[in-house]
């Protein structure tokens, strides 16, 4: 979704991860792919505005967002975060104007999309369980909820996002 918004002049803030690249992903475009040691050093250095680790079927994967990138973000910047990542950034940068749009997917849509990108069955199940816990009761914190289920027209989803952001 963030990449699609680039067609409308928005810039994606590229986040960091230690997980292996998937087919078609590119260094410094999809993510900044770094080693676990480098990631942990960046945590110690206070580099991240927010970060999270996941215990996956392939090991521990870390994800995080650069504090500097968030501080330098403008009104045309987009970042994908977990609810806790959003909370962490709001806490660290309370004066930053951040609009939170929750892209809701039902479980069937999540399963299809995760499987389509090549995740195995165990990883799909782990991810869904994790997301259900992470996003529980998050609707009340979001500024806008946009439903993005299977069969939803991508242009319709983009229009709802743009209409909301441009009115904010």
Model-derived regions, located:
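Short glycine-/polar-rich loops that comprise or flank the Walker A/P-loop
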Residues: 10, 94-99, 140-142
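Switch/connector loops and helix/strand junctions flanking conserved nucleotide-binding motifs
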Residues: 23, 87-89, 108-113, 154-157
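Hydrophobic/aromatic beta-strand patches that form the interior of the parallel beta-sheet core
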Residues: 13, 32, 99-101, 144-147
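Post-Walker A alpha-helix
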Residues: 1-3
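NTP-dependent small-molecule kinase module
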Residues: 112-119, 136-168
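Short beta-strand-centered segment that lines the nucleotide-binding/catalytic pocket of NTP-utilizing
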Residues: 8-22
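Conserved phosphate-donor/acceptor-positioning beta-strand/loop module used by diverse small-molecule
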Residues: 78-83, 93-117
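ATP-dependent small-molecule kinase phosphotransfer cores
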Residues: 19-77, 83
């Amino acid at each position: 979704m963030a990449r699609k918004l680039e067609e409308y002049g928005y810039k994606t803030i590229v986040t960091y991860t230690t997980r292996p690249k998937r087919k078609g992903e590119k260094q410094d475009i999809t993510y900044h792919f770094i080693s676990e040691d480098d990631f942990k050093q960046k945590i110690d250095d206070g580099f991240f505005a927010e970060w999270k680790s996941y215990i996956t079927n392939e090991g521990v994967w870390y994800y995080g967002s650069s504090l500097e990138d968030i501080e330098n973000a403008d009104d045309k910047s987009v970042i994908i975060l977990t609810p806790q990542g959003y909370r962490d950034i709001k806490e660290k940068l309370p004066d930053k104007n951040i609009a939170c749009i929750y892209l809701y997917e039902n479980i069937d849509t999540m399963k299809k999309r995760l499987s389509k990108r090549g995740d195995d069955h165990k990883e799909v199940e782990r991810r869904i369980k994790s997301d259900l816990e992470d996003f529980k009761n998050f609707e009340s914190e979001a500024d806008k909820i946009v439903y993005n289920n299977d069969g939803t027209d991508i242009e319709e989803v983009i229009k709802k996002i743009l209409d909301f952001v441009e009115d904010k």
